[in-house]
Amino acid sequence: MTPEVMTAENTRIVVDTSSNVPDALLARYRMLEVPTLVIFGQDSFRNKHELSEQDFYAKMAASKVLPTTSQPPPAYFADAYRQAFDEGAEHVMVVTVTSKLSGTFRSAQMAAQEFGVDRFTLWDSN
């Protein structure tokens, strides 16, 4: 259920790693970050979790094939939502890369259904 008044104390913000929110801001505003996938050939990595920025550029320099990306599966969003609610959030605001470029927004929507969509504000950044 959506709280009558959304505050910093009862609301958590969830973003995907394509937003490139600096770590200091993620920490300051207690944001949770869902990793997009970076794919080099047959190898898939969770952006910023299994592949640092330095590792990304090193792999790119060493690879003959350019990397691609993929949307996070709904389970990654569900994990972030579960963490937010376990830590006391009453409401979750989700901001994703535009649905015109990625299926990330759809993954966020699908995961929200597990918890009751009235507990969410989902914002497609298009």
Regions found by a protein language model. Give the residues of each.
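Short beta->alpha connector loops at strand-helix junctions that form conserved
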Residues: 35-37, 123-126
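Short beta-strand segments
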Residues: 15, 94-98, 124
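Short, charged beta->alpha transition segments
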Residues: 74-84, 107-110
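Conserved beta-strand scaffold positions in the cores of enzyme catalytic domains, especially
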Residues: 33, 94, 120-122
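Short Gly/Thr/Asp-enriched flexible loops that form oxyanion-binding sites at enzyme active sites
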Residues: 96-119
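N-terminal glycine-rich anion-binding loop in soluble enzyme alpha/beta folds
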Residues: 12-76
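Glycine-rich phosphate/diphosphate-binding loops that line cofactor/substrate pockets in enzymes
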Residues: 4-7, 79-90
